[in-house]
Amino acid sequence: MATIDFYFSTLSPYTYLAGNRLEQLAAAHDAQITYKPFDIQALFPRTGGTAPKDRHPARQEYRLIEMERQAKKLDLPINLKPAHWPTNAAPSSYAIIAAQNAGGGDLGTLVQSILRACWAEEKDIAEDAVIRECLTAAGFDASLADSGLLAGAETYGQNLEDAVSAGVFGAPFY
């Protein structure tokens, strides 16, 4: 069975806009997805990138135009300037890592619900209640938000190192 390494950030609007197309592609080709959330804010300086807030105003403006265009094309609701962005991506990423390790639910649905919470629902994905709600909606035990924090932190850090080694420079990256 083929495996797809999916590097992403729960803060990334482009990961949100990718929707569930990866999961559809994997299902159509009998491939397995390894979800690898990483710290995109730490990735940018290590790979020659610039965080959105530090980009030239013309680039910032065009980014919003392109995000709106893509959201319309994909028929996805989007708030171009979410109230809780950027926020701490670590808690939601740790929950995804814990859910992947635990199994039993729908990981793609979990990832999409966290991204949707940030980019369409004005929720703070660093908040425990939001993470628990997303876990439950995807068929996972909400207590995963609390368990595996140490393992989640270790894996989250390793995912960043793996991303740099693999030539990842943004999110999503496959």
Segments (PLM) and residue ranges:
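C-terminal cap of thioredoxin/glutaredoxin-like
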Residues: 4, 10-31, 101-104, 109, ...
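Structural alpha/beta surface segment adjacent to cysteine/selenocysteine redox centers
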Residues: 10, 17-118
